[in-house]
Amino acid sequence: MELAFIDSYNSIEKNKNYILDLKNYFIEKITSSIPLLKFNGICEDNNYSTYSILNVCLPVSKDKSVLLEFNLDLKGIACSRGSACQSGSNTGSHVLNSILTKSDLEKPSLRFSFSKYNNKSEIDKVIKVLSDFINSN
């Protein structure tokens, strides 16, 4: 156990840089694939946000958004519609409720978390699935 802790501690900076690179890659790919997407809060600003989380508001109608999580789940993509502290709640995120406009609250927001176990090919898959979903009839 002690060796695992030491190894983990010694890898913190390397893992942080790897994860930050993934987050930046995701930002670059998603903004070019889904131009009307909005970042919730300042999550895309690496100077003022955590390096492992992004929360986005997608340009999808309320009716179509009902199928979004189901579609992502079928494709093997794990993400969340709410904040971690609201897990299991139907009231929505109090943070998103306070920072989003009424029209943006009607659109789906998704939270993506990145770790040292993710890779760019997984991000490419997420971007393709989201882009295909948004552009489908």
What annotation goes with each model-predicted range?
Residues 2-137:
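Pyridoxal 5′-phosphate
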